[in-house]
From Swiss-Prot:
Catalyzes the aldol cleavage of 4-hydroxy-4-methyl-2-oxoglutarate (HMG) into 2 molecules of pyruvate. Also contains a secondary oxaloacetate (OAA) decarboxylase activity due to the common pyruvate enolate transition state formed following C-C bond cleavage in the retro-aldol and decarboxylation reactions. A divalent metal cation binds at residue 99. This is Putative 4-hydroxy-4-methyl-2-oxoglutarate aldolase. InterPro entries: RraA, RraA/RraA-like, RraA/RraA-like_sf. It comes from Pseudomonas fluorescens (strain SBW25). Coiled coil: none annotated. Substrate binds at residues 76-79, 98.
Length: 163
């Protein structure tokens, strides 16, 4: 597991990175995470989040455009534990999560807007690996994302921590 410091990455790569608007909180067991972006667009339905958590995710971060909904949780403890088991570096969710006490103990990076106790409906609706935009940034599958307690940044190419 790599450790990232987003202010240091911003200082080292000012012309490469885009910084997300500061609306996310760190809920995961990892205080920093980063990797290749896999995108998902869904609204109050986490069926595809669960499907992706079942896939191998080494070196990858699932970026979920949940439309900013504050009415349902797109991630809970069971899906988070499955994602960690399958090697995902983390998730950045433009929406809510639940089971925050368990997720805080899970070896997974999780950034989201807030917690909400209500689960989603399961309709199987959503789009995988599409370009999504939220928090002032456009996310493209195959680009890179880095997150810590300072914020979340995106780069078109992988970044290395400065010496």
């Amino acid at each position: 597991m790599n450790h990232y410091v987003t202010p240091d990455l911003c200082d080292a790569y000012p012309d490469l990175v885009q910084v997300l608007e500061p609306m996310f909180s760190n809920f995961g067991g990892r205080d920093s995470f980063g990797g290749e972006i896999v995108t998902l667009k869904c609204f109050e339905d986490n069926s595809l989040v669960k499907e992706q958590a079942d896939q191998p995710g080494a070196g990858k971060v699932l970026v979920v455009d949940g439309g900013g909904s504050l009415r349902r949780a797109l991630l809970g403890d069971m899906i988070a534990e499955k994602a960690a088991k399958n090697g995902w570096e983390g998730l950045v969710i433009y929406g809510c999560i639940r089971d925050v006490d368990v997720i805080a103990q899970t070896d997974l990076g999780v950034q989201a807007l807030a917690s909400h106790p209500m689960k989603t409906d399961k309709r199987g609706i959503g789009d995988l690996n599409v370009v999504v935009t939220f928090a002032g940034v456009t996310f493209r599958p195959g680009e890179y994302i880095y997150a810590d307690n300072n914020g979340v940044i995106v780069s078109p190419s992988p970044l290395k921590m400065p010496e």
